[in-house]
Structures are given as structure tokens and as C-alpha cells.
């Protein structure tokens, strides 16, 4: 049975999450609250919220866990040309934290295959906006001709980034934002992005699954590191164009 958490109740061990044979693998707990303090504690333990309007707050820690190692980010020949154009043409901009709430709302409105409605509710937007104001959540945004056309947002503690959602109004706009994030994190020696759950799109970009035990162990170490700077320089993206994917960083995680 999934435990119900009162305001002062701690999270159970992630090992108590429902298993693959259940109808909701990875479900750990439920609660009525989504306080920033609860959200911060969750991420530091490798737990995230995911629920729909009308449901209680559901907390998850799936096994295995989908991650993206920045050194393993895959760039196709076609996308390489796109990145070169973004770097070359001033009409393309990559901004950080310029319109965090706008990115969240756009992610909420983006159509998703096989999904009706959105889990990015008004309550979720309020909670993550609180983290953003505290400097713990960030948006990476793709702008074209002065208009935001894509982006992503996530949570950052220490040397760990937890990706949440992305959207694109024009082709490749979300992928450009992800490439910018990868380049920025590589610059700051962050070796793992949490992607939560497996999708074919993430796998095509180099994402892969690792055991929850290995994921949680890495999170525990990474969140204790000093926070990274979120001053962004577009030129760091150029480093992705001349460097092949490396398996070096991957050696720290089991496959």
C-alpha cells in the first residue's frame, strides 16, 4: 500500500516504491501538499512529483531511471548544421531564466502523444516558480527574431540537474535548448541530467537507463557539491560541434 504523507512525515526509502509488477511502478508515496520544502527534499532523495488535476500529489522514484550523461549527448549531422546556424546568425538567441513561468506554461500546453491534459498544473507552476525565485530551478530558452520559440526547465542542486519538461513551437527549438544545457553543464563538469522516464526521443539523443540504486547514490554526492553558475555564454555550444561523445563519464554509472 502506498503511504500517505502528512505535512511533517518524511519520505519512505525509495526501495519501498512499487515494483514493475504493480500498476504504477515507481510510485512511492502520496500527499496533499506540494510545499517548496517538500519538493527540495524530494529532489535531494531522487524523488519527483507527477500527478494530474484532481489527484493527490503522487511521488515517484522509478527503477531503472532514465538519465543523460552530457558527454554522451548525440548530435546528428542534420542537427549539427542547425547548431552552426544558431551560432552564426544573431536572430537566434539562447537565454537562461528570461521567462521561466512562460516556459512552464508553454510546456503545459504542448501536445503530447498518448497524453490527454497535462500534469503541469497551476499548483506545479506555483511550486516550481518558488524554486526558481530561490535560484533552484532554471529555464533554458530558444529565441528567434525576438520571440521565445522553445525551451526546457528543470531543477538544479549542487552538481546535479533534474530535467522536467520541454517544448518547441518551431522545429528543433527544444533540442537547441537541450544542446545549450548540455554544453553549459559540461562546462561546469556536471556529469548527469535526470530525465526521469524512458522515451524514444531521449534515447535517440543519448539518454539511457541506470539502476535506481546507482542513480540515488550519485544524486546524494552531486547535490552536496557547490552550486554551479547560471550565467550562460552561447559560445559554449560550439564545443559540442568539435567533440565526439565520450564514454569516460559513463564509467561512474552502471548500465
Swiss-Prot record:
Q: What start and end residues bound the annotated signal peptide?
A: none
Top-level taxon: Bacteria
What catalytic activity is recorded?
A: N-terminal L-lysyl-[protein] + L-leucyl-tRNA(Leu) = N-terminal L-leucyl-L-lysyl-[protein] + tRNA(Leu) + H(+); N-terminal L-arginyl-[protein] + L-leucyl-tRNA(Leu) = N-terminal L-leucyl-L-arginyl-[protein] + tRNA(Leu) + H(+); L-phenylalanyl-tRNA(Phe) + an N-terminal L-alpha-aminoacyl-[protein] = an N-terminal L-phenylalanyl-L-alpha-aminoacyl-[protein] + tRNA(Phe)
Which key words tag this protein in UniProt?
A: Acyltransferase, Cytoplasm, Transferase
Entry keyword Protease: no
Instruction: Name the Gene Ontology biological process terms.
Output: protein catabolic process
Kindly state one GO CC term assigned in the UniProt record: cytoplasm
The Enzyme Commission number assigned here is 2.3.2.6
InterPro entries recorded: Acyl_CoA_acyltransferase, Leu/Phe-tRNA_Trfase, Leu/Phe-tRNA_Trfase_C, Leu/Phe-tRNA_Trfase_N
Q: Which SUPFAM superfamilies match?
A: Acyl-CoA N-acyltransferases (Nat)
Q: Which GO terms describe its molecular function?
A: leucyl-tRNA--protein transferase activity
| Compartments reported by the entry | Cytoplasm
Q: Which NCBIfam families match?
A: aat
PANTHER family membership? LEUCYL/PHENYLALANYL-TRNA--PROTEIN TRANSFERASE, LEUCYL_PHENYLALANYL-TRNA--PROTEIN TRANSFERASE
As for family, the record states:
Belongs to the L/F-transferase family.
What exactly does this protein do?
Functions in the N-end rule pathway of protein degradation where it conjugates Leu, Phe and, less efficiently, Met from aminoacyl-tRNAs to the N-termini of proteins containing an N-terminal arginine or lysine.
- Official protein name in the record: Leucyl/phenylalanyl-tRNA--protein transferase
Organism the protein comes from? Burkholderia thailandensis (strain ATCC 700388 / DSM 13276 / CCUG 48851 / CIP 106301 / E264)
Its gene is: aat
Amino acid at each position: 500500500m502506498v503511504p500517505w504523507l502528512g505535512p511533517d512525515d518524511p519520505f519512505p526509502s525509495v526501495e519501498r516504491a512499487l515494483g514493475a509488477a504493480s500498476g504504477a511502478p515507481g510510485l512511492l508515496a502520496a500527499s496533499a501538499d506540494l510545499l517548496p520544502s517538500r519538493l527540495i527534499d524530494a529532489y535531494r532523495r531522487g524523488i519527483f512529483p507527477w500527478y494530474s488535476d484532481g489527484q493527490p500529489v503522487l511521488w515517484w522514484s522509478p527503477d531503472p531511471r532514465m538519465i543523460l550523461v552530457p558527454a554522451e549527448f548525440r548530435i546528428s549531422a542534420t542537427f549539427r548544421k542547425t547548431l552552426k546556424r544558431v551560432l552564426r546568425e544573431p536572430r537566434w538567441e539562447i537565454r537562461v531564466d528570461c521567462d521561466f513561468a512562460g516556459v512552464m506554461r508553454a510546456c503545459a500546453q504542448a501536445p503530447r502523444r498518448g497524453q490527454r491534459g497535462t500534469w503541469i498544473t497551476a499548483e506545479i507552476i506555483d511550486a516550481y516558480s518558488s524554486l526558481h525565485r530561490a535560484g533552484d530551478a532554471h529555464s533554458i530558452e530558444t529565441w528567434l527574431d525576438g520571440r521565445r520559440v522553445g525551451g526546457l526547465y528543470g531543477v538544479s542542486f549542487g552538481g546535479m540537474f533534474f530535467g522536467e519538461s520541454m517544448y518547441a513551437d518551431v522545429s528543433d527549438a527544444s533540442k537547441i535548448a537541450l544542446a545549450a544545457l548540455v554544453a553549459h553543464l559540461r562546462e561546469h563538469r556536471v556529469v548527469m541530467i535526470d530525465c526521469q522516464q524512458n522515451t524514444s526521443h531521449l534515447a535517440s539523443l543519448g539518454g539511457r537507463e541506470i539502476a535506481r540504486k546507482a542513480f540515488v547514490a550519485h544524486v546524494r554526492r552531486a547535490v552536496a557539491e557547490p552550486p554551479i553558475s547560471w550565467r550562460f555564454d552561447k559560445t559554449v555550444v560550439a564545443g559540442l560541434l568539435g567533440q565526439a561523445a565520450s564514454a569516460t563519464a559513463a564509467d561512474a554509472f552502471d548500465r
